[in-house]
């Protein structure tokens, strides 16, 4: 029996005519439907998704080919509903846009958000503006926004552990659109958004953005400034050494875009601060992530003796090992007394490069993030692999065996 996606359009008919488009498109992908019928219905969904450790982002058309497209569509509906309910844009006739004003495209990005063990946490749909179509001096100026340094994160987590401080994480929902837009920006209707249900012609209308959507060049700066002003108004001072660390008498806050870590010795300081955000004039919308167990893909766990903690990135290591093509169940790992900083290069390194079916530069990027975040012992081999402009797969395979053995 063929599987079809069925969902009820919301937003006063905003997506009414799109339902048929989605159903027709998904039904045309017979193989995807067969996978959904024969696999997902016979296995627990978590058994399949835990095996597929993908971290790919999908476009609108690619999302429709996925066996769990129905879950992505629900996330898309929620994303659109959140934007409309918070007046992030205004639908206006195309003729009302200033003469000669360039409208930018809207882009959907879909991704499966996972727990550290690989299970799916949620299906994420993100509506972005095509910032590459903006014009400097017309609809944007300054764009730079700082991000927290991992040195600050590690240092403050160590301090929190030593002093037995309270830690808590919060995640701002639709963070960028919570910031005002200083100049008007006009955007085409996103894929899946149709006005036919309202008796209007979609081609005759555009969106006038009221807030800083994701993708806009100035979006990150506008959001950072809004959050910074809110923290300063609550008695926090920006750290001299790191502009994303804010300090008050009772609390320290680490800010990484829309993810924050709250650290305090006072048991009531964190709840009081969260309440002030909920009731404040900024109208912040966020979720309380509870105690800090995972942050930015890095898992933290206290040592059994209670005198320290470990930081690990198991999902990233999985991606590196699988990208090279190793089977984690059968590949021989390396776990010996030779330090990871031991040089990997030898006299044959200048020989012809070996061909491989994986992206060498992508792996270098992942290794760079891994060694800079939780595995400083990999700095030397990562540096040596990165110094080569051509693929030397024997180096990468040797390093991956080390990763597999020191999981």
Q: Can you say where each PLM-predicted feature lies in the sequence?
A:
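Long, low-complexity, charge-biased intrinsically disordered regions
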Residues: 3-407
